[in-house]
């Protein structure tokens, strides 16, 4: 069943809607202002957002090795420039991470949409050296681990 979660702000509280149980997590990008009713999808959302946090951490550290933990080997990155859609292998992102080096990175999770073993996440991100972006990720669950299959972005 397809579930849509709207998540607004930066840092910590996830609520399980069934049974009134609250669960704390330390996912970057979520806040106690988030109104998330996850029920049995709590573990999925946490695992999905782990991949997004690895992406952000790769930016913070300028590390392609950390980035590789977030993406599948066949992942792609896309954007529109001058009206033309460009898609490149994710290795282009890794090269950019290494060239840019360490920087401050923050993000806000806006949407998490799960359908079985695939998911979509939309974030607003800010990189101190590169600027602000609208990032959208398509993820798939592989061997119990969520990996980013595609990143598409626009510059804010």
Which role does the model predict for each range below?
Residues 70-76, 83-84:
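Acidic helix-start/capping segments at beta-turn-to-alpha-helix junctions
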Residues 47, 80, 87-131:
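Surface-exposed, charged secondary-structure patches
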Residues 23-61, 69, 73:
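Short, low-complexity N-terminal intrinsically disordered segments enriched in polar/charged residues
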Residues 1-30:
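Bacterial Sec-dependent N-terminal signal peptides
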Residues 55, 67, 75, 121, ...:
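Hydrophobic pocket/interface hotspot
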Residues 71, 81, 113, 124-127, ...:
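A mature extracytoplasmic/lumenal domain signature
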